[in-house]
C-alpha cells in the first residue's frame, strides 16, 4: 500500500470514528432532554395534584420547550387550559397533539370538548366521532355523552337520544347523560320521558349542580321532584 493510500485510509477511519462519536453524543443529548422533559411533566402533575395550576402551566411549557414532539405534553397543557376556562388557547395545543399523533384518541376527545365549549358544535361532533373510532380512547362513555349533547345543540334529536342512551349503557350512573337525555325529550315534547330522565339525574346526586338543575327542570314540567 502506498503512503498516500495509507494516509487516505487513516483519514477515512478517523472520519468514521468522529462520526460515530458525534452520533453517540447526539443520542445522549436527546436522551438527557427527554429525561428533563419528563421531570418537568412529573412536576406539572404534582402541581395539579396540589391544585396549583400556575406551577403546572409553567412546568408543562418547560416540558414542551425541551421536547416539542411529545403529543402527551401538548394534550395535558390543553386540558389544564381548558379547566382554566381558556378553550381558545387549549384548542391550539390539542390540534398540535393530534398532528403529532393522529391516533391519540383522548386528544381528539379533548379537542372536541374545547370546540363544544366554544359552541362550534359541528366541529365538536367530528372530533368526538374521530375519538370514538379509535380503540385507544380511555373514556368512551364520556365521549358518547358529550357527542349526544353536541347533537342535541344541532337539533339532531333522534341521534342524540341514541348516543346518550348508549353512554348510559356504558355507565348507568352517568348523571349528566340522564340530564341531557331529559333535554332531548323536552325538545321533542315528550314530557313524561323527560320527567323520568330528570328524576333519575336528580336521584343519582341530588345536591350536585346537575341534581339541582334537574330539580328546576322538574318544577318547570309541573313536578316538585
Sequence positions of predicted segments:
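Structural marker of alpha-solenoid helical repeat scaffolds
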Residues: 32, 66, 100, 134-136, ...
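Canonical tetratricopeptide repeat
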Residues: 42, 76, 110, 146, ...
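Residue-level recognition of tetratricopeptide repeat
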Residues: 36, 70, 104, 138-140, ...
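TPR alpha-solenoid repeat register
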Residues: 73, 107, 141-143, 177, ...
Amino acid at each position: 500500500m502506498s503512503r498516500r493510500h495509507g494516509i487516505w485510509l487513516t483519514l477515512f477511519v478517523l472520519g468514521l470514528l468522529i462520526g460515530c462519536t458525534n452520533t453517540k453524543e447526539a443520542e445522549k443529548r436527546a436522551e438527557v432532554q427527554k429525561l428533563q422533559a419528563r421531570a418537568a411533566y412529573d412536576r406539572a402533575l404534582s402541581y395539579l395534584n396540589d391544585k396549583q395550576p400556575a406551577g403546572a402551566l409553567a412546568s408543562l411549557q418547560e416540558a414542551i420547550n425541551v421536547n416539542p414532539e411529545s403529543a402527551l405534553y401538548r394534550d395535558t397543557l390543553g386540558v389544564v387550559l381548558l379547566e382554566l376556562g381558556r378553550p381558545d388557547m387549549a384548542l391550539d395545543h390539542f390540534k398540535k397533539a393530534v398532528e403529532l399523533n393522529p391516533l391519540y384518541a383522548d386528544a381528539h376527545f379533548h379537542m372536541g370538548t374545547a370546540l363544544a365549549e366554544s359552541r362550534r358544535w359541528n366541529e365538536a361532533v367530528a372530533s368526538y366521532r374521530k375519538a370514538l373510532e379509535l380503540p385507544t380512547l380511555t373514556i368512551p362513555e364520556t365521549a358518547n355523552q358529550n357527542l349526544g349533547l353536541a347533537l342535541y345543540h344541532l337539533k339532531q334529536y333522534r341521534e342524540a337520544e341514541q348516543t346518550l342512551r348508549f353512554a348510559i349503557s356504558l355507565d348507568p350512573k352517568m348523571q349528566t347523560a340522564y340530564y341531557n337525555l331529559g333535554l332531548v325529550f323536552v325538545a321533542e315534547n315528550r314530557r313524561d320521558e323527560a320527567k323520568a330522565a330528570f328524576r333519575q339525574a336528580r336521584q343519582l346526586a341530588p345536591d350536585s349542580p346537575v341534581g339541582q338543575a334537574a330539580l328546576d327542570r322538574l318544577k318547570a314540567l309541573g313536578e316538585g321532584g
